[in-house]
């Protein structure tokens, strides 16, 4: 089954680098259709969707906000879909609140979030220390494993 990914560009390559690397590894060998603009979000039925976004130091991403608006204005846009989300930020703030906001919008648009649908990466990746220890890897390896 293919995956539809929505990855709003931040426009700051140095901040997007870590998320891009994780996505490259997580999506390797999978059929994925990746869209980067809000206008590209089209109604879908029963698909697997992934929202992966990078925030700046102020917790902002302009294209993400446009995607969020589109989800909120179209309550059946993701009807019957199953989804997940990855939120990556350069600091220790804003990732959780952004993830909660996006999860609610996805759910209200008809997308089910099943199991452990959220991967939250703070700047230090401190939230991956225990997972890294359990997996015998470093925090980046744990982040990548969680995204898969």
For each predicted feature, which ranges?
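FMN-binding flavodoxin-like domain, especially the glycine-rich phosphate-binding loop
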Residues: 2-37, 43-148
């Amino acid at each position: 089954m293919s995956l539809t990914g929505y990855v709003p560009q931040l426009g700051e390559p140095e901040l997007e680098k870590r998320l891009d690397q994780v996505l490259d590894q997580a999506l390797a060998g999978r059929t994925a259709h990746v869209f980067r603009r809000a206008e590209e979000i089209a109604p879908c039925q029963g698909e697997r969707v992934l929202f992966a976004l990078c925030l700046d130091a102020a917790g902002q991403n302009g294209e993400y906000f446009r995607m969020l608006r589109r989800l909120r204005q179209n309550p059946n846009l993701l009807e019957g879909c199953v989804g997940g989300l990855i939120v990556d930020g350069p600091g220790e703030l804003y990732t959780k609140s952004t993830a909660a906001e996006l999860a609610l919008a996805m759910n209200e648009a008809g997308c089910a979030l099943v199991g452990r649908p959220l991967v939250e990466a703070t700047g230090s990746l401190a939230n991956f220390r225990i997972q890294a220890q359990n997996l015998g890897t470093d925090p980046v390896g744990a982040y990548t494993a969680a995204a898969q």
